[in-house]
Amino acid sequence: MNTYIATFFMHFGSIRYERLCKSKGYQARTMPVPRNLSSSCGTCVKYIASEPLFDRDHDEMETMVICNEDGSYTRIYKAEGL
């Protein structure tokens, strides 16, 4: 299992995504974006899963990173135009 953080352009996107994660049975929570990641709205969703979860309509998502064991992040998704 891996830990992922997804950031969003607006708060509603993070709330909606947290619900999606929980509906799939993943441990997920909305939280402030870590200082070394940026987000337009300041909230993100941190969740644990075997694979990243991409909603069919994920245009609300700004970025997604995987959390590495050493505390660093590896970006696995970035919205077009950023």
For each feature predicted by the language model, list its residue ranges:
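Amphipathic, hydrophobic secondary-structure cores in small proteins
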Residues: I5, H11, I15, L20-K22, ...
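C-terminal structural segments of small proteins and small subunits
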Residues: E51-L82
